[in-house]
Each structure stands twice: as C-alpha cells, then as structure tokens.
Amino acid sequence: MDAFTAGLLQRIRTTETDLTRARDEGDDFLVEVEQAELDDLRRLAAEHGVEVGA
C-alpha cells in the first residue's frame, strides 16, 4: 500500500470516528461538516481506485 492510499484510508477512518462523535453529541452542524468531508474523501478514493469499506 502506498503512502497516498494509507493516508486517504486513515483520513476516512478519522472522519468516520468524528462523524459518529458528532452524531452522539447531537451536533447537527458538525454532522453536516463531517458527512461532507467523508463524501469528498470517498469520492477521491473512488477516483483513484482505492477500495473503502462500506
């Protein structure tokens, strides 16, 4: 696994964790921010052929 792939997957995992935390805390604004970031990261992964878990 190259550095780009490893870094991208790490950012996705971190964002998923942050999204869960925002949901648990009831922070609707932060949920929207984190969801948008996650969507962007998943799009980037797809564009580069990086497989991401569901």
Region roles according to the model:
Residues 1-54:
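C-terminal-biased regions
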